[in-house]
């Protein structure tokens, strides 16, 4: 079972209103991941109602709300609270990071990002989620 989970392509939901960033993340992830994207909190919530991704990646600055708002919504949802959340943003102050973690984010990556680092962080979040699930 562990091997099949390792070989399965991870499902990622990326929430960012910047087309350039969405394209860059798609290019960075390549074929090893299934990427779905949303441009706003509203689009993200509709996507999350349809499926539960392996990892949710969101920008702090969204056109209709903040990434912290999305984090809070996900953490309050019994169906989604298990989904690991990574914030991927240009906001880099300690206060921004603390706000993200307090809202429920599991990881915080500052743009610009290195593709290998992003992939490593996504895989780590997925592995932690899997270990928590296996422990019951």
Model-derived features with residue positions:
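Non-catalytic signal-transmission and effector/linker regions of two-component phosphorelay proteins
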Residues: 1-13, 17, 126-129, 133-136
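Active-site residues of response regulator receiver
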Residues: 59, 89
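Two-component/phosphorelay signaling modules centered on CheY-like receiver
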Residues: 18-37
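The feature encodes the CheY-like receiver
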Residues: 22, 62-63, 81, 93, ...
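Acidic, metal-coordinating helix/loop segments flanking the phosphotransfer/catalytic sites
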Residues: 37-55
């Amino acid at each position: 079972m562990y091997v099949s989970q390792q070989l399965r392509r991870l499902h990622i939901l990326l929430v960012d209103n910047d087309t350039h960033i969405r394209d860059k993340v798609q290019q960075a992830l390549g074929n090893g991941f299934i990427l779905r994207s949303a441009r706003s909190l509203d689009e993200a919530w509709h996507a999350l109602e349809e499926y539960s991704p392996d990892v949710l990646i969101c920008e702090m600055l969204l056109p209709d709300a903040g990434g912290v708002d999305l984090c809070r919504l996900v953490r309050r949802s019994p169906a989604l609270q298990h989904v690991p959340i990574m914030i991927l943003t240009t906001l880099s102050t300690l206060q921004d990071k603390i706000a993200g973690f307090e809202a429920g984010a599991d990881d915080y990556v500052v743009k610009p990002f290195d593709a290998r680092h992003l992939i490593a962080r996504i895989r780590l979040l997925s592995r932690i989620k899997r270990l928590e699930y296996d422990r019951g």
